Amino acid sequence: MNSVDAAGLGIGDGHPPRIMGVLNVSEESPYDPSVYDDPAEAARYVDEELIDEGADIVDVGLESANKRFDVLTAEEELDRLDVAIETIERVASDAVFSIETRYAEVADAALARGFDMVNDICGFADPAMAETCSEHDVAVVKMASPPDLGRPGAVEEVDWASRKSPEWAADAEYVDKLLAALAEAPLTEKTIVDPAFGGWSETKTLANDRETFDRLADFRELDRPVLVSINRKNFLGELVGRETDERLAASLGATALAVDRGADVIRTHDVAATRDAALIGDAFGRRRD
């Protein structure tokens, strides 16, 4: 089942790589061009800078996932949801709208009010998330994470000796831990998996992300489409010695490689250029072999 229907949008085998553009209604978010708190301005940005430039999906974040900031409660996210709802109601163009949240309560409210899918960076740490998405019959992105709402992506900090076995923990590579985290909670029929690129914890290393790139095809063994979020990430900056606003070229190179190695969805702030890079990776890469 390496394909999923997301509100009529086919994702995975038999479909072109899909582009997920980003809108943040959170002032804490690290990339300023995507941050809006006025629904009219946000809707204009979505229409002109995301959908018109080639975004198939618009992912709306209610808070920054940056570990430097405190995690919002579900109630605090719900307080910001009205801006997100009013924004998508004002958008004139067609797209699939995704709500980024770790809370099933927030996902349920967003889906009931017009959102089409969920992006869960905590990988079903909220035990009600999978059931909520199944009840709404929507696609959901599950990022590789420990079962902890406060530590998205921090799979290397899990006590794997206790969760699996001391022998498994001693032999496991970083990607083995990502795959184990994704497999721990049941995947819904419409789950898309995310291998958690980027600096999600203090112990995450550049070597970890290199290993993930090298083994990206392994995530297809989960029999689900794969989403990668690599746009302007710090690990790319480390490789090329560039700050965030100078990392577009590095991001595009990584995008083509990711699609070549099996990625089905690319999450990005730079929609038009990322779309082009993804199409090149698709046309000349190995993902269709």
Task: Give the predicted meaning of each segment.
Residues 1-10:
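Short coil-to-helix leader/linker segments, especially the first N-terminal amphipathic alpha-helix
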Residues 6, 14, 18, 27-32, ...:
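Active-site-adjacent loop and "lid" segments of alpha/beta metabolic enzymes
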Residues 44-61, 258:
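Catalytic domains of carbohydrate-active enzymes, especially glycoside hydrolases
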Residues 48-49, 84-91, 107-113, 173-185:
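An active-site-proximal structural segment forming one wall of the substrate-binding cleft
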Residues 51-52, 111-112, 129-138, 183-187:
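Acidic (Asp/Glu)-rich catalytic clusters
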